[in-house]
Amino acid sequence: MTVGRRLNDEEAIPLTAKEAGSRDSIDSSSTASVSLTLVDGTNHTTAKPSKSAHKGVSRDRYADEKYRDDVEEDWEEDRYIPSNAKPSQRRTQIVFWLLVALCVGGWAVAFLFFVTSPGNTISTTPDTGSGSPDSDVIKPGSPPAGKKIPLDDVLGGAWSPTQHTISWIAGPKGEDGLLLQKSEGGTGPYLHVEDVRNIHGTQSNNKSMVLMKDSVFFVNDERISPEKVWPSPDLKTVLAMTRQKKNWRHSYTGLYWLFDVETQTAQPLDPGAPNGRIQLATWSPTSDAVAFTRDNNLYIRNLTSKTVKAITTDGGANLFYGIPDWVYEEEVFEGNSATWWSLDGKYISFLRTNETTVPEFPVDFYLSSPPDYAPKPGEEAYPYVQQIKYPKAGAPNPTVGLQFYDVEREESFSVDVKDSLNDDDRIIIEVIPGSNGRILVRETNRESYIVKVAAIDATKREGKIIRSDNIDEIDGGWVEPSHTTTYIPSDPASGRPNDGYIDTVIHEGYNHLAYFTPLENPKPKMLTTGKWEVVAAPSGVDLKNNVIYFVATKESPIDRHVYSVKLDGSELQLLKDSEKSAYYDVSFSHGAGYMLLQYQGPKIPWQKLMNSPSNTDSYTEILEENKRLAKLSNEFALPSLHYSSITVDGFKLPVVERRPPNFDETKKYPVLFHLYGGPGSQTVNKKFLVNFQTYVASTLGYIVVTVDGRGTGFNGRKFRCIVRRNLGHYEAYDQIQTAKAWGRKPYVDKTRIAIWGWSYGGFMTLKTLEQDAGETFQYGMAVAPVTDWRYYDSIYTERYMHMPQNNEEGYETASVSNSTALSQNTRFLIMHGSADDNVHFQNTLTLLDKLDIMGVHNYDMHVFPDSNHGIYFHHAYKMVHQRLSDWLVNAFNGEWVRLRDPKPTIIKRVIRRLLHR
């Protein structure tokens, strides 16, 4: 599941997220991106703290209300007094003295409450239990007396690390270590290729090549400013796109142009339809053709002529060629492409998606509509309705099939694969082009526990299943879509007599790298083993030296380090000079001779370019040190992070506790639990991150705890797969048990514990409140929650729950339906965007109806008109977080306790009578 992702919004990560920073149905990156190179949509954030950070507006807002509830005084002015009322002097005096008496009495009660309340008793007993969070403590460099963090700074990206995204590119003759760079400042050529060792362009280098001198070009006197560009593999032509128009999370349309590097001139990709909006365009590996999809049909343009040939002609509202539909884009490919060229450029593989039987779901827009939408006369007052083909759990899925196009013969064909899954039970999750017309296809059944790998020979037009696994029989789990399977071509001179591929497989209860060779061999050579897991591997492959690079959790499930291993499984090595407790990421050049190493935490992030271990040409350059962020960290008071674990039912759960600056163990603190909790996700890690949770601890002065319960990732398959068929049960139990443990700590006020989450985290918030029934958690805040998995999309839901037809009891149990249990909590908050195309507003409305039926009213509700799952429309994103902050302060100040059973007081009635005489 995904949501549009913004800066520092791991609380809103998509349901499909594999780990906190990887993606958002809430989009990801949690960092600002500064691009020296060309990436899709470059971005440079140089945000500074808002003025309020220096004026201290937010700093003291709740300074007197951090650790105790205010006692409510019932002597407010009666708002129903008529504006022209004139009470006598005697009555006024009576009222005055009554008010004075009430004030004195109220203060006395408040003082008595403060000194006797169990939430304010002073404890001198230190926390020395086995679950002490002091086992791994990260304290910021800032002084505890530093400034508090304004919420606007967090939401605005001032605390986002500056991050450079490198666009590695292979040279025309396979040269390694080349970058694609774009100059935004008007100095130097607009688009050029540079050697990584000359990234700043200060040296003369024969590998440098100018592709586009200027940032604009003209076609028939029309001024063109490219928004995205893709050079051909031979670097002689640039495919440029303008007038981008967003579709779904990853997809868009635009006008495409072919720019000739030698003449610096351009022409439309399709001269016959220059204004036709194209959905996808991809280069042939031989640079002589472009395949593209327009109006859901696939075309090919050969650069030697200006003619365009249609590969398909029946595409339309229900048939897609070469691009995914909504659910495949969202849950399978996580991108906009379903077109793959063979490595020799002779064949095109493309997906045919048929949505005819998929039901539609209407999304209403009350305040907005597409720019080209014009209502019929007299219908201006009606909402714009967007119909989405959205397969919910148990409903018909789109049927998909892989088709092929022979470029030389100009003909399309299909390949029958014996023992392949049936059309109505197939999800194609990955297509891997190989050499000599070979293609690997990974497919799963609808419930994602059968995985098959087919090898197809497009030249012979035949294929067969070369591998089949039943995950249900292995560990009762499921298969996640992945896009990292890597084809390894044969090279006898380098010790590779046969073609093969590297895949991530289940080995002794953990995800590990395996090398399958020859191609048809179902029994692999294990490249990694142990009680740890590889992450989106491999990251790079050095075919010259037979070295594989990957990121893994070998040091700790919450750390990430870079490793290398030989293709024969020998010489597993940690990257030299790596810090023991750290979170690294890496991207490699085309031949894996160079890499961009990214240190992402726990200290201030940095980036550097360097040669890979298998490259003897030594090179290192610091690309980013984030000095601005280091300066901020020394000016503002950040919470300290205390990493630990808690054992529940024999499972060791990772925990991070954020303690406020100036933390005092003799005081009692409220605690906010924040969670996501989706299958395979991870929220507890060693990344540097200043987000809403940081703000709550730093500025509001509350403790914030996050625990990754069962079902989350990187702790082994047993830990992850226990939630199969029963989402919400074990995850909620783990949150409750952790909260109980924290409630026993001497510095925690167990009468003030809250929980909150977004998307899957919103679902988990409500399930936790439901299962706990007010025993441990008093408050909860759920944003865009799933409340019934029958309402969510089929591919995601059935992967973990099976189809409703095969797990009716599980779906019933997993729904948020126990209104009586929810009524036992002090109060909870629900927020949702009305135009959420991912987690439909239907989820929240259904829950509200259940609450109405049972007469439950201890909740607040906020609807954001026309906002999708990310909740942005009309400044809604800021409103969400401000509402969360204010609501939480009111909760911990005791406001919701007062509202739980509202009754007029005798004193108010007496005052009302006196004033109305």
From Swiss-Prot:
GO cellular component: fungal-type vacuole membrane; plasma membrane
One function term, GO molecular function aspect: aminopeptidase activity
Positions in the Cytoplasmic compartment: 1-93
Biological process annotations from GO: proteolysis
TM helices/strands, residue ranges: 94-114
Keyword terms: Aminopeptidase, Glycoprotein, Hydrolase, Membrane, Protease, Serine protease, Signal-anchor, Transmembrane, Transmembrane helix, Vacuole
Reactions the enzyme catalyzes: Release of an N-terminal dipeptide, Xaa-Yaa-|-Zaa-, from a polypeptide, preferentially when Yaa is Pro, provided Zaa is neither Pro nor hydroxyproline
Residue ranges, compositional bias (Polar residues): 40-49, 124-133
Protein name: Probable dipeptidyl-aminopeptidase B
Organism: Arthroderma gypseum (strain ATCC MYA-4604 / CBS 118893)
Organism ancestry: Eukaryota, Fungi, Dikarya, Ascomycota, Pezizomycotina
